[in-house]
């Protein structure tokens, strides 16, 4: 399994990458492709195809700051989900960012949400694959998130500093992050 930049060595997967991005994430949570491409050109984001044996498996989009990285989007192709690819990809990502702060945003658990079961399943998946709760809940772009890291250590300030380093003050203003709870 390898991660390939869709603008360089992974350009043959670009069409599948964007197709999965459009399909896998709610409209309200998607960033404009032009913004992500601009951030990638600036070295503040990476857009990676997950491939194995020359087959497209999924996508990873990371925000990159000097002191931390943030997993912005992660998806496995629907036709191969539950095949162990997601867990293997997460393990490789954790190895890749070992020794660096690596932040994961997951939708906050909410039994009344229409996708409550999906949220439960996603959280179990991430915890099973080595992530830990930080105790931080934040509202970002009108969505409630729980923040996870490999070591369970994070402050809300580190989180917002990471967003600011990647998106700038204007981007943070648009996202309008607010703290719901910190441990």
Residue ranges and their predicted role:
Residues 97-118:
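Conserved GNAT acetyl-CoA-binding A-motif
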Residues 67-78, 105-107:
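Conserved acetyl-CoA binding element of GNAT-fold acetyltransferases
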Residues 1-32, 146, 151-165, 172-182:
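Short amphipathic alpha-helix that is part of the acyltransferase structural core
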Residues 76, 82-96:
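Conserved acetyl-CoA-binding loop-helix of GNAT-fold acetyltransferases
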